[in-house]
Amino acid sequence: MAYIVKMAKTRRSSKARLLSSKEVYRGPAFRVTMDQVLEPSGIRARRDIVRHSGSVVILAVDEDRGEPHILLERQYRHAAQRYLWELPAGRIDPGEKPLPAAKRELKEETGYTARHWKRILHFWASPGFVAEAMSLYLARGLRAGPARPEDDEAIFVRFFPLRTAARMVMRGTIADAKTISGVLWLSQQKMTKTRNR
């Protein structure tokens, strides 16, 4: 059963108003601001926001094996305190456009290049406190080559059948949100094509 919460009509589409913003941290990958805002409800609030230049995620699909296979990376993530299976991804450098960043990240981390690219999703990583927009690209027509990961990246790369990756999501073996988004998107596309035959 769905529940609907009614909002006051005058506040429904209004935004919070920024009263002040102070940078409290600046590092090589992101900065943090402490913002004072006036919420649409009229309440003053402090919001600590991680400011990020944005990221790209690559759903690299090999369609030459009968069933689609997706390229996943396994690497240790200190914040999660564990190894995670993930789609290739990375930060957009300042001044860089998302598509060139996606092509660069796929080649650096996996060695693969792709002939066909399409942006399929655009979403926020964790909008409660992180200002990081992510663009998810579908990459097809893959060609293998040498990887050039950064010095601090130890990445194991492997193709998984889409069916297996979807099971990994449902079992919690894939626990990374951007990867879950990509796997579910491709699973839905495959189901839609199957139904329309």
Regions picked out by a protein language model, each given a short descriptive name:
Residues 8-9, 13-15, 66-104, 108, ...:
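Conserved Nudix-box catalytic region and its N-terminal flanking loop in Nudix hydrolases
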Residues 166-197:
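Long hydrophobic alpha-helical segments typical of transmembrane helices together
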Residues 45, 54-57, 91-177:
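Unchanged
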Residues 41, 62-65, 76, 140-144, ...:
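Short loop segments at secondary-structure junctions
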Residues 20-59, 65:
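Acidic, metal-coordinating catalytic segment for phosphate/diphosphate chemistry
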Residues 6-26:
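Extended interaction-bearing regions that mediate binding to partners or small molecules
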Residues 31-35, 83, 133-135:
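Short beta-strand micro-motifs in enzyme catalytic cores
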